[in-house]
Amino acid sequence: MPGRASKYINTLARTWRELNPKGILFWEPWELSAGQTYQCVDLLDPTCVGLSLHSNIAEVQIGYPADRWFKNMLTKAAQRNIPVLGELWTGSPTEEMEPFLHIPTPLATLRALRAVNEAGKLKGIKEYYGNLPEQEDPNLRMTGLFFKNPDISEEEALSQLAKPYREAAREVIRVWRLASEAVEMYPWDVSWLAREIGRSSPQHAMSAAILKGASWQTPSWQANRRVAFMRTDQLEAPNFWMVEDVQMRFEQTAEKLEAALRVADLIQNKLPEPLQHTFRKSIEEMGSFRVRVLAYAYHLRETNLANLIRGASRWGLGVNPDNRNELRAVMVKDQANMGTEEPMGTAIRMLDADPKKFLQTYFLPRASSGKNQDWADWGSAANWTITSPNEFFEKR
């Protein structure tokens, strides 16, 4: 593969050089494994080929910029004088966050820019996915500040960024910090399907929570991305500790979002009028983000608690009342988060009236049909609700 790919790229680049004596063809070695890309660098023509690289072997992740693969690629490229463009998110609309377009995480953006810029020798930095420059976008404006002064401190950058918000600037900075920390805390590494959370449904299945993985038949997915993501298939139920880990990180994310929303709600009417619309959209989207994060956390915790109670019963041990009480409390919060009485109401009543029947009915493993995501219906909740099997949505 490296020999064939590099020969093809070199031919294209040399042809371009014949047409444009100063031309450089920038190539993005997408979906190749780390080993393949390293070998390709050794075979490329440095006189006319450049590289455009994701800042992570798993493409681009705001929480994991400039991974070891990216740094190694910069080292190898520098040794052969091959120019490199580093790719990351420079604005709010990203593949990770869509359909949310207004969640402001400028501090996370600055940290990602700095990590990529300091990873090695770069010819430049470019946007990976695309922006909406006509809207107020603190993330994109932060990128502009960084390009102007890569050594700017976080405090100075946030201060300059918030100037248009006038007397509300200090509180707006607080919102940005909390939202950035929430997105950095979010467990992007659990599965590729953890992205695009706005497409997920808070009304999850009442069977045991799963953690849906995704994978494709490419070198990167069948090699390195098995390390980048905790789940790349759905062949086995996730371990208790994995479920708990992801649940706790979802909870931490939700806490940061709740804190950001408290501050944002207090100041939304104090902003200059031209900035109010986008800020209110940010509040709306952060609220929707939090609802979905909580839905994941609740479903995962309900599953582990139900399994703890079942395990005690199987071993002839008494049920820990703390587990049962916590399970009920989580279900009540989950019901409120769903925004609907059912199906959680029936489950809560059964837990109260007949705990044994409840354990035989709810949060049990569901036999998998082996059905994968239906990408013909890209934006469906079935594809993107990672704790619920696709079949659950088909039967609703």
Where are these regions (language model features)?
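Substrate-binding groove of N-acetylhexosamine-processing glycoside hydrolases
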Residues: G3-R396
